[in-house]
């Protein structure tokens, strides 16, 4: 993957795909269209991805991996003080900087599983925080609160992205942080 040509080709494929995704649903995009727009052969596409859905999943994994790395940086160890605001701020800033990708990813016409994957990412992170705070004991109450929080956070982010991100990342972060601090974990 370190080969510059490989990186450049993958980038061209992703950009072409995202441009097409702005105009069409994922089900109506062909490898031939991506290849033509990226100025590559179809065979080159298949050297990098199995199909269009593999490409889509690769993009999802890339952006969700970045969100996960922000969490790891905000909560480096179990003995480290919890830094929820830092995580929220980094995440909303990243989403804002990549608004085109996120707007396309959360579009239900493209794939409803994206929101579910985002919920799963946040669930794993919130359960980790609760586990640290409760010395490894996650109660049934914690599980219900986690589901509630995740749906709320993802819903707020979906609304924020879907309405053109009128509020700044800092404003959204502060709102989410304030709401989360009011909950009894």
Where are these regions (language model features)?
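Basic, helix-initiating cap at the start of DNA-binding domains
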Residues: 1-24, 37
């Amino acid at each position: 993957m370190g080969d510059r040509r490989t990186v450049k080709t993958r980038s061209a494929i992703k950009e072409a795909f995202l441009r097409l995704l702005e105009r069409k649903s994922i089900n109506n995009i062909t490898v031939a269209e991506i290849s033509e727009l990226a100025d590559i052969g179809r065979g080159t596409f298949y050297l990098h991805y199995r199909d269009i859905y593999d490409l889509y999943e690769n993009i999802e994994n890339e952006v969700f991996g970045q969100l996960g790395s922000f969490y790891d940086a905000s909560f480096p160890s179990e003995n480290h003080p919890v830094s929820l605001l830092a995580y929220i701020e980094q995440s909303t800033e990243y989403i804002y900087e990549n608004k085109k990708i996120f707007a396309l990813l959360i579009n239900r016409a493209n794939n409803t599983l994206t929101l579910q994957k985002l919920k799963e990412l946040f669930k794993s992170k919130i359960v980790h925080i609760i586990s640290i705070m409760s010395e490894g004991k996650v109660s049934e109450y914690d599980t219900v609160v986690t589901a509630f929080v995740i749906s709320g956070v993802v819903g707020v982010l979906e609304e924020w992205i879907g309405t053109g991100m009128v509020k700044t990342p800092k404003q959204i972060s502060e709102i989410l942080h304030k709401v989360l601090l009011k909950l009894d974990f």
